[in-house]
Curated annotation (Swiss-Prot):
Keywords: Acetylation, Capsid protein, Ribonucleoprotein, RNA-binding, T=3 icosahedral capsid protein, Viral nucleoprotein, Virion. The lineage of its organism: Viruses, Riboviria, Orthornavirae, Kitrinoviricota, Alsuviricetes. The N-terminal arginine-rich stretch does not seem to be the major RNA-binding region that allows formation of an infectious ribonucleoprotein complex. Residues 11-21 have a biased composition (Basic residues). This is Capsid protein. Its main location: virion.
Length: 218
């Protein structure tokens, strides 16, 4: 067995093979990735000179409601076993929670996988009782009751799945910033073990503007 075969065998031993196999990258794929990176850098450069509340990745590029801005938090689930769960309450920065009576209109989850991701996950946001410890049994029951929409995110060979966002409208509930600690992001790894940091979840919380928001997000 040569060195490359030995390395491959060691890698397969450490991790159970996925349900499907990826096709070998083509030159067209490589060119597409390079072009995407160039466009991304160009967009960042242009955006830096145009402060605006029309955030390019928020609510599908919708404009924030008049008098509102948003706060983003990033969640990186730890390793999740096959057919198991992860839950994390929404904890905003102290500079935001200081204004706990400011209304929250919407919560959006954006799913961004790392390159090694090739699985299926279910993602949702739920209002969770303070007494809940977000155990596997508790999260499983919340996914099963059908009381909230669920984003099914699947591996896409061409890159990020087109539908990678889930939007929750809380305006009718008169929820405020102080209520956000009662909500949690829940993840179900359906088909495979999800490795540490294999998935990144960006949670955008649109809320009434607060005095500390002196600079518009871009």
């Amino acid at each position: 067995m040569d060195k490359s075969e030995s390395t491959s065998a060691g890698r397969n031993h450490r991790r159970r093979p996925r349900r499907g196999s990826r096709s070998a990258p083509s030159s067209a794929d490589a060119n597409f990735r390079v072009l995407s990176q160039q466009l991304s850098r160009l967009n960042k450069t242009l955006a830096a000179g145009r402060p605006t509340i029309n955030h390019p990745t928020f609510v599908g590029s919708e404009r924030c409601r008049p008098g509102y801005t948003f706060t983003s938090i990033t969640l990186k689930p730890p390793k999740i076993d096959r057919e198991s769960y992860y839950g994390k309450r929404l904890l905003l920065p102290d500079s935001v929670t200081e204004y706990d009576k400011k209304l929250v209109s919407r919560i959006q989850i954006r799913v961004n996988p790392l390159p090694k991701f090739d699985s299926t996950v279910w993602v949702t946001v739920r209002k969770v009782p303070a007494s809940s410890d977000l155990s596997v049994a508790a999260i499983s029951a919340m996914f099963a009751d059908g009381a909230s929409p669920v984003l099914v995110y699947q591996y896409a060979a061409s890159g990020v799945q087109a539908n990678n966002k889930l939007l929750f409208d809380l305006s009718a509930m008169r929820a405020d910033i102080g209520d956000m600690r009662k909500y949690a992001v829940l993840v179900y790894s359906k088909d495979d073990a999800l490795e540490t940091d294999e998935l990144v979840l960006h949670v955008d919380i649109e809320h009434q503007r607060i005095p500390t928001s002196g600079v518009l997000p871009v």
